[in-house]
A protein has these predicted regions:
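C-terminal catalytic domain of photolyase/cryptochrome flavoproteins
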Residues: 12-220
């Protein structure tokens, strides 16, 4: 009962935080209380969740940053060198890549916990497993934080110095995030088709020529 009340209070506080922001008051501590409440309510079972059946081994370059994808290389390199990275680097570059390629959930969570100096499991696990990897099936996030190369291009200048082009989907010089993104959508069409926040993306993919879709998925 105590834990249930804690989580219930967290939901109330989260709602209050949105109201406060509309009034010009920022209360980030309410989100922290919510995440901590989820952790204490759902652990230890939560740690084993893998809604998308992601099980590919963590690539070696997560420990060397030796990849030709510049945004990913720089994000990993900075993380290894400093034990820190910007939120966008953690979620929308490294986390996004792990999500799109179906990297093993436990291995990814352990990497985040071991690499970042500000990582405590009670806050790292829900953010990585739930938000970045969508492995908890919408407990934390109502949609997967999946994005193509065009989104990453808007977040920085790495694409200007990268051999891959964010405007291309297939081909040797195409940004891998693009084909991986559409393969991810194709792989989980049934799951995301009923999600209102994913409906437009799913509909656009289904409208594409079947041969074009097959080429993109194969390239990914």
């Amino acid at each position: 009962p105590g834990i249930s009340n804690w989580v219930a209070s967290s939901f109330t506080l989260s709602t209050a935080s949105y109201t406060a922001r509309w009034r010009g008051v920022n209360r980030p501590e309410t989100g922290i209380v919510y995440i901590r409440g989820i952790y204490w309510l759902l652990m230890p079972e939560y740690k084993n969740r893998n809604a998308l059946s992601a099980n590919r081994p963590l690539p070696n370059y997560f420990w060397t940053a030796n990849t030709e994808m510049r945004c990913l290389s720089r994000a990993i390199e900075q993380s290894l060198d400093h034990g820190y990275a910007h939120h966008i680097q953690r979620l929308m570059v490294i986390g996004n890549f792990a999500l799109l390629t179906g990297l093993d959930v436990t291995e990814v969570c352990d990497w985040y916990l071991g690499v970042y100096v500000d990582a405590y499991e009670w806050v790292e696990l829900p953010n990585t497993l739930g938000m970045a990897l969508y492995a908890d099936n919408a407990v934390i996030a109502s949609k997967p934080y999946a994005a193509s190369g065009k989104y990453i291009q808007k977040q920085g200048n790495h694409c200007q110095q990268c051999q891959y082009k964010p405007t291309k989907v297939t081909g040797p010089d195409a940004c891998p995030f693009n084909s991986l993104y559409w393969r991810f959508i194709d792989q989980h069409l049934d799951r995301f088709g009923g999600n209102p926040r994913m409906g437009l993306v799913v509909a656009n993919w289904r409208k594409r020529d079947p041969e074009e879709r097959a080429v993109i998925v194969q390239w990914a």
